[in-house]
Every structure is written in C-alpha cells, then in structure tokens.
Amino acid sequence: MASELPMFGQGAGVDRAACLPGAERCAGLRGLDLSMDALKQAQAPLRSAPTRPFLPQESPLSMLPCRLDRAADVRRSPVLAGATLIVRRLFIFVGTALLTLAGGYGMYDVVKVGGVTFLEALLLGLFLVLLAWVAFSFMSALAGFFVLLTRRQPNLPIDTTGPLPHVTSRTAMLLPTYNEDPHHVMARLRAMYESIDATGYGEQFDWFLLSDTTDPDIWISEEMAFIELRRACGGDQLYYRHRSDNTARKSGNIADWVTRFGAAYDHMIVLDADSLMEGDTIVRLVHAMERTPSCALIQTQPVIVNARTLFSRLQQFAGRVYGPLITAGNAWWHDGDGNYWGHNAIIRLKAFAAEAGLPELRGRKPFGGHILSHDFVEAALMRRAGWAIYMVPAVRGSFEEVPPSLLDFAGRDRRWCQGNLQHLAVLPTRGLHWVSRLHLLTGIGSYVTAPLWLLFLLVGLLISLQAHFIRPEYFPKGFSLFPTWPQQDPVLAAWVFAATMGLLILPKLLAYLVLISNREERTGFAGSGRVLAGVVCEAFVAALLAPCMMILQTKAVMEILAGRDAGWQVQRRGDGQLARGEVYRKLAGPTLCGLVLSVCAYSVSLPLLLWMSPVVLGLLLSIPLGIMTSLQLSAPGVFATPEINEPPAVVLRANELAAAEPTEMAGALRQLSRDPELLAEHLGSQSPASSRRFGPVDVPLATATAKVARCESLDDVLAWFDKLEMRAVLENPTLLRRILELPAGGRD
C-alpha cells in the first residue's frame, strides 16, 4: 500500500547527478524543494472515484505467522494411518532398502579387491546415498504402474465423467502476477472465467488478479487490460489489486489477500500466471472439498501445454507420459499426507488462515528471511494441525506452461533451489508429520544430489588417476613386502552400472506400457509406435542434457552456500529465443568441465574416456544443445501429446484471445494522460495516503516531488524520472495529477 513507505536509503538508490537525456531541460536536484511541506502536499489524499471499484468490500480473516518451535494446538482428531496404508508404505521403504543394499553389496564387491582404500570407501558411501535416491523413485514408479494398470480407485475419489455435481460454497480464484505480459494473463483469466460461467455456477466464484508488478508501464497496462476484460465479460465478479509492497513475494501476495478478503469465501484456488483450468474441473474440486470436511487442500496434476520449442516439447512429452505414473504412485502411499505444488490447487481458507501463516526464518539471505518455496511448508503446517492434503492425479483439466529453453529452466531452477535449501531450517519444526518432513527432504535432495553425482564422478576419476600416476601408499598394518594397490572388478562394475541405469530407465518403459494398455490414451498420442519413438528420443536427449543440468544445479547449490541470493527475476516465456552471447557465457562452465574431464580420463586410458563418454559428451555439447533445444518446432513430430493433437477447449480459447491484437500502450504516464476512464480507475484504486506526520522517508517519492517542481512538461518528466520514481508517482494521486496537468511538449 502507498502508506507503507520504505526506510530512507533502502532499495535501489537514485542517482542524483545523472539526469540522462533530460538533464539539459531539467535542473539538477540542487536547490529543489525537499521540505516536509512539499512532501506532505504530495502525500495529501486526493482521489477520483472510479466508475466501479477494482475491489469488493473487505472481509478480513486473521492469519498470523505460525510458530516453528512449538507444535500446533491441534483441535482436530488426528488422521491415523490404517493397516492398508502401512502396508503400502512398507512396500515403498522396504523395497528401497533392499534395492539399496543389493546395489551397495555389488559395489562393495567391485572395490574390495585388494582392500578398500579411503577414496574407494568414499565412492561406496556416495554410491549408497545416490542409489537410495534412485531406488526410492523407482519404487514409487512401480507402485504407480500397479495403480494405473489395475485402475484402482484413488484415495479421494472424484467423479470426472458423470453429471456435474451441485455446489453451494463460495470460492475465490486467485491469479498472482509479477511483471507478466498483461495481454496473455488476461487471455488465460478470461478463458477460465468463460469456462466456469458455462457450467452454470459462475455466481459462486469471484476472480482476483493479484499484482505484485514493479514495472510502471506494465502496471498501467494491467489496469487497462483489466478494464477491457471487465467490459468484455460484464464481470461484477472480476477484481484487481496492485500491491506496492512486495513483501514475501507470492506467499505474501496470497497472505495479503487472505487477511483483507478471505472471510467472504470458503475456498480459494491458487493459480500461476501461466495456469489454466477447465470450469468443469474447478466445480468438481469444489464439490470434493464440500463433501470432505477433513480436507484442507487438493492438488491437481497440471499438464503442460503450449510448448513451442524443442526443450519445452521434451518437458511436455515427458510430463504427459511419465508424470501420471509417478504422481499415481506417490498419491497411493501418501494418501492424506500429500503435498502442495503452489498452484492449480484448491485450499480451504479456514485451514490455511489458521495454520499456514509463514514466519520469517532467522539469519540472512539466502537461508534466512521470507520462505521462498512456501508451498511445501504451507502443506506441512496444515497437515501438522490434523488437516488432510490430497493429490488427485486422475483429475484432468488442469494445465500449465514451462520455460522455453535450458537457460530459462536453469534460472527458475536457481530460485527453486534456494527455496528448497531453505527448508533445512524448517525440518526441525515441532509437530510435523513424518511424511511432511520427507516431502521437505525430497525437495532438498532433488538439488543436493547434483553435486553428489558430480563428486561421485570426480572420486571415481581420482581413483583411476591415482592408480595410473601416483606411487601407491596403501600399506597394510605390520610388515609387508607388497603395497595394497587400488583395484576394481571391471566386469562386476559394468553389471552394477547396468542395474543402476535400469532403475532410471525402467520407469519410462513402465509408463509406456501403461499408456498403450489404455485405448483412449493410445489414440490421443496417435498410436503406440509413435509414443515409443518419442520415449526413445526423449531418453536420448534427456541423457545429453542431464550432465549440463548437473553442473548448473551444482553451481546453484555452491552459490547459495556462499550466501548469494537469487533475487526475484521475471519469468521469461514465449518462443525461447536466446542471445548467442548469453548462451556462450552461461554454458561455458559446463563445457569447460567436459573438456577437463575428457582430458583427465584420456590421460588414464581410452577405455576410461569411453566409459565416461555419456557424461563428457553431454558437457562438451552444452552450448549447441542449449541453442538447438531453444529453437521452435514447426510440428510436434514424435513428441506429440493429446493436448497438441486435440487441444482442450479452455486452452484453445486462451490461445485465441492471446492471438488477438493487444491494445496499443503508450507508456504509463502518456496512457493515463490520454485515457480519462483509465485515470479515474487508477486513482480510485489507490489506498489513501498516510496522514502521519513523522516516519520513514520514501526516497523515490521525495526525489520525484523535488524533480516535478523543476519540470515544465510531461516530456521532461519522462526524460528525467527513473522507474522507482515513476512508480512512486503512480502510487501518489496528488503528485500524479500535478504531472498530468503539465503540457505534453518540452522546452525549446
């Protein structure tokens, strides 16, 4: 809100000497009126009433930060695992343990020849940790194969084909956005609005576009697009809120809405800026919440759509083929102890507000501060209080998009990595369900395993280099004429390697078998032969990309451990086109690693280089792979999915709306000066300025106020103001009106 002014000196500073192109037309800051009277005048609440408010009447709902050092005050009856669920979990964990022990014993046989050295012991330890990770994923996939093949009833049955159920509760649809393309955001929102309206239950839903946008031009463009959306839909249930204080990012955005409007609703469905959901699916989720009062959250499995580049098509195909197997297996043994992915999920507001308020973590960034990966933690806190959390992979009609290139994916992965490593501070939270702790550990492990795999490769290479170049120093205790040379059994090592690769590849084959056993799915993919070709091609390209991702994730972990914060960058979407210089700069590291590994391996022997060729080749090809996979595909080819062959109605509608020519935007101030309706709506949406006499100084507002006094035209303002000052102007009705009263042209 405009009254929540930052402390003097916080945030990006204003360069008082640099007036840039407007320096000749505008005087410098020296001598400008920075008096308190001038600032008070700028902060005076002068507003113009809009034709229709951007927001409904507030209905506050208390949401306080929870305590991590004290167990929740559970007033609900605890959900206990039944015998069936215990057996399911024993299957997963006993199977994981047996596979790990068998593989570990095989690896011990490989290195024990001639005695186990320190490096060999380290290699064995790393192998056990990594194999346990692979085996755990394999067992969940095996469970998913059993569930899908036998078509077992899910833990939370939702009828996805019968008549639409009757719903009576009120649900808020929340779409947070941060510097996204307003035209595309509104296209998706309108497509979902129309889809729900077609069900006949449109009156039960209110829609909130929750903007954390910091770019002034995008902010005003959002308001303009929102007014057009309201005009097109006639929607009295469409609302827009811009938050000037971006505290806690997305989780803070949602929490702000809950505390202001949450009491008016029973549920909320949280979306991402790239989310799409069918109205039929949304109504069925609401009905499931109504008939399951013990449930706090139902998470759908979003299907990837609108993939246009090779990289995004790979993700779309893999997610569509392998995703159902993995999520079905997880849901089978998670039951009501599931997880939350942050979007495309329905949440009971009473449970969320009471239990999921997030505290700030102690310490400095990147480990301290606001919790970035909030979704896992929010689910764990609600589960701690006795609420059930369900994953429903069988529910269709939930969609999302993915980054279009390897570098965009790595950028998002960097933020997720920091958020997941923050969970190390959440793990000791008192009262968490053990499955919730496992979810947190799994998220941490998904990034920590990358440096562990790299370390495993390096230790293996060191053992080979040591045996080849360095005199042995491994003497047994007591007198001996001969040293203990590092030795391995190469034949057994090949078998252990093959078995490990089998655990990685077999889930893909199981997913393929499930798919071709379902006639509807097989037809949607245009035949089993085409799917098999896609599986083979996806596995090949993914194997080439995996070493590069290993290096990028290792770099991310190292940066976080060194205290480097990821910040909050805008998610790049669209066609995935990359500047060659950016690709060379960001993928030079993996390429150099591949060169070093290949030289070291070849210095030992050609067979060792061939043994390491899958890793070395992927690293050496990082740059061409980064470029090639970011190219657009004219046809889906073997990576076609049912959503490409026959796009769902809501996806078609969103794409149709997005393809329409957007309204031309002239820049924030010029657009407001030309559009009285937009100006009235913008002024009316602003919160009243604070009337307090003393307090922190808003530096951008202060400098903007001083500069306005020396500007004689709108052109002067546009030339001299930076984005922080422009944003301060847009948040201050009086100062904005003063600027818009200036003539358009500059001084002669």
From Swiss-Prot:
It is an enzyme of class 2 (transferase). Pfam families: Glyco_trans_2_3. It is found in: Cell inner membrane. It comes from the Bacteria. GO terms for cellular component: plasma membrane. Keywords: Cell inner membrane, Cell membrane, Glycosyltransferase, Membrane, Transferase, Transmembrane, Transmembrane helix. InterPro entries: Glucans_biosynth_gluTrFase_H, Glyco_trans_2-like, Glycosyltr_2/OpgH_subfam, Nucleotide-diphossugar_trans. Its main location: membrane. It is a multi-pass membrane protein. Its EC number is 2.4.1.-. Pathway: Glycan metabolism; osmoregulated periplasmic glucan (OPG) biosynthesis. CDD domains: Glucan_BSP_MdoH (cd04191). The chain crosses the membrane at residues 85-107, 127-149, 443-465, 494-516, 529-551, 587-606, 608-630. GO terms for biological process: glucan biosynthetic process. The keyword Cell membrane applies. GO terms for molecular function: hexosyltransferase activity. The keyword Glycosyltransferase applies. Belongs to the glycosyltransferase 2 family. OpgH subfamily. NCBIfam families: PRK05454.1-3, PRK05454.2-1, PRK05454.2-5. Involved in the biosynthesis of osmoregulated periplasmic glucans (OPGs). This is Glucans biosynthesis glucosyltransferase H. It comes from Bradyrhizobium diazoefficiens (strain JCM 10833 / BCRC 13528 / IAM 13628 / NBRC 14792 / USDA 110).
